[in-house]
Amino acid sequence: MNAVRKVSLVFVTIVISIPACSFPQMLPPPTLAPTVTLPPTNTPFPPVPPTDTPLPTDTPIPTLTPTPVDLWENFPGPSQGSATEIPRPVRTVIGSEDSVNIIVIGTDDAWWRSSMNSDLMVLVSINPNEGTVSLVSFPRDLYVYLPGRNMARINIAYAYGGRDLLALTLLYNFGVEVDYYAQVNFASFEEVVDTLGGIDVEVEQGFTDVCNRTYSYQSGRTYHMDGLTALCYVRMRRNSGGDFARHVRAQEVLLAIFRKAISLEGLTRLPELYQQYTQMVETDMGLSDMLPLVPVAAQVAQDPTRIERYTFAGMTSPWTTPGGGSVLLPDREAILALLEVALN
């Protein structure tokens, strides 16, 4: 009984004391204030250091770009650098209509030599319409451009490239178009003269020199020469005229051969002589090419004034190459003027 009374009393005490306890008053949940959205601000970049304001500059004047020029035109350019300036090709010399240009070449390719340099070069220009012939000698030491190679003496053109290179060299440097060529060496030259029974040469300038023996010639006289004598006469160099005197003598001998070949005896033997000469002379001129020129040859044989002879005396200047070679520089304009007369 007492135990029940104690429990009841405790329970009553708790109930009475609950209101007297200071528990916090329950508040309503707070109302959240609206969120304020701030406008975005630009993110500042790092400061840029100040720079100098450039001063105005002048606008450059445009330069003209030169149009590339083919220095060699239709000719082959040099195969290597040149120690000297290579001249431009000259204009082509326009000869008379139907004229025929033959380059006659004397080479020093004897058996004891290894070269085939041209010792003599004579251009024979035949004008059938006028019945005239011009002989033009080219000095072997002319310093010219060999198309496709370099600057060199003209006398090596045939040795390096045969007829084609020599013809191209004459066209490039002197404007001469070559139709045919005839090449003879020293031994064959003697045979040509001996086959004709020797030739009669009219000597313009007398001199004395030694070849296989001592020769003495007087001006204005005619001398009968066999092959060896004629060869020595052409090649002698010790007289006062120098190389240009050799050109004159070569022309004298060519005319003597021509006169003998075109004589009555020569004409009757023409087919025979042609067959013999093809064994001695290298040429691209056939018998059918020669026959149309026989009437002109007959006219010239009867009238020697129809033959004109030219050299380049006074139209060259001596010069020493960087390698020490002695050559002749051509006065191209003077030579062109001469050729325009000779080929017309």
What are these regions (language model features)?
Residues S22-N344:
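Non-catalytic, solvent-exposed segments at the cell envelope interface
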Residues I18-A20:
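C-terminal motif of bacterial Sec signal peptides marking the signal peptidase cleavage site
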